[in-house]
């Protein structure tokens, strides 16, 4: 399994596009961990709609480390919220 760890703080503008691009992946054996640095916008609500595991984080190393600590996957993929992946990205990478 792949653990996708996303570091966020007030990312409501970008996060939906990233999470949609993850959902649309051909590769499906993953979990999404959102390591959030106390967002005050809709970031958490958006992540909940995509069934992300939400944890307290920080920017950037604390958030990445916190995400890695709870990850269940054998592989870790760290992403920023403004990333969008083509549908075959995980299939070709993992």
Model-derived regions, located:
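Short aromatic/hydrophobic "clamp" motif used to bind/position activated sugar donors
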Residues: 76
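Glycine-rich, basic loop-to-helix element that forms the pyrophosphate-binding segment
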Residues: 56-71
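Conserved short acidic donor-positioning loop in nucleotide-sugar-dependent glycosyltransferases
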Residues: 22, 36-38, 58
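Short, acidic, metal-binding catalytic loop of nucleotide-sugar glycosyltransferases
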Residues: 20-29
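N-proximal low-complexity "stem/linker" segments adjacent to membrane-targeting elements
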Residues: 1-21
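Hydrophobic/aromatic residue at the end of a short beta strand that borders the catalytic acidic motif
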Residues: 79, 83-89
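A short, amphipathic alpha-helix embedded in the catalytic core of nucleotide-handling enzymes
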Residues: 22, 89-94
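A conserved acidic beta->alpha catalytic loop
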Residues: 36-44, 83
């Amino acid at each position: 399994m792949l653990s996708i760890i996303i570091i966020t703080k007030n990312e409501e503008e970008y996060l939906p596009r990233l999470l949609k691009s993850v959902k649309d992946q051909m590769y499906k054996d993953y979990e999404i961990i959102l390591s959030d640095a106390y967002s005050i916008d809709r970031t958490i609500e958006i992540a909940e709609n995509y069934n992300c595991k939400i944890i307290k984080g920080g920017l950037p190393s604390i958030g990445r480390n916190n995400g890695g600590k709870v990850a269940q996957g054998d592989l870790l993929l760290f992403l920023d919220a403004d990333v969008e992946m083509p549908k075959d990205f995980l299939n070709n990478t993992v």
